[in-house]
Design a protein with these regions (language model features):
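Mature catalytic core of soluble alpha/beta enzymes
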Residues: 1-207
Length: 207
């Protein structure tokens, strides 16, 4: 729905959003472990794995490199980075600058860095930004007070999923989830304030 309206530069009506929301339910994902199949219960439903695709690809690429005897590599899939071997400095994109201009950077070694934000894929109508990360409760782009969420941990796939959850739910609900998962984070708010979890306070450099 939103992809179609983005192409036209329009905003879907409330009725269209409510109709789309009526098709959203994780209970409609039917998995058969024996047959190794997945299907959706109702006509008109679709499953978008975009929020975890880069993370999965990065983890698989890293696994293949390790199996091939590679000890030093950097995988960069745009917002999803996996570092192997020597220490590296990874930049965190400034939400209001052109791609490649960092707001800050962190030093990483043998770990993954994943960022979810509203600044790469969006369109504007009457001065309002409509980005691609949707809130499944409202059907509209998430508005939880964050511009970007950067997470650091061993699995890019898991970080991809978790960063999206935190972005949609905001810092107040997201920080306890991060603490429970043992994941460090850099959060950038709507006001461009930067918050780092305790494990990154000495590591993060604001540019």
């Amino acid at each position: 729905l939103w992809r179609l309206h983005a192409r036209c530069g329009t905003v879907p009506s409330r009725a269209e959003v409510e109709q789309a929301l009526s098709l959203v339910s994780d209970e409609d994902i039917l998995l058969d472990e024996t047959a190794r199949t997945a299907e959706l219960a109702r006509f008109g439903q679709s499953l978008d794995l975009g929020s975890i695709a880069k993370g999965y690809a990065a983890d698989e690429a890293l696994r293949i490199l390790k199996e091939g005897g590679v000890h030093d590599a950097l995988i960069n899939l745009g917002g999803t980075v996996s570092a192997l071997g020597r220490p590296r400095r990874v930049g965190i994109q400034h939400p209001d600058r052109v791609t490649g201009i960092a707001m800050g950077r962190i030093s990483v070694e043998n770990t993954c860095v994943v960022t979810s934000g509203d600044y790469e894929r969006y369109y504007e109508v009457d001065g309002v930004r409509y980005h691609h990360i949707l809130d499944p409760k409202t059907g509209y782009p998430a508005r939880a007070g964050l511009r970007s969420v950067t997470l650091i941990g061993p699995s890019a796939l898991e970080l991809d999923a978790l960063s999206t959850v935190v972005f949609v739910n905001g810092a107040e609900e997201g920080l306890p989830l991060l603490k429970e998962a043992g994941v460090d984070a850099v959060l950038v708010t709507d006001q461009l304030d930067v918050f780092c979890t305790d494990g990154l306070r000495e590591n993060f450099e604001l540019l």
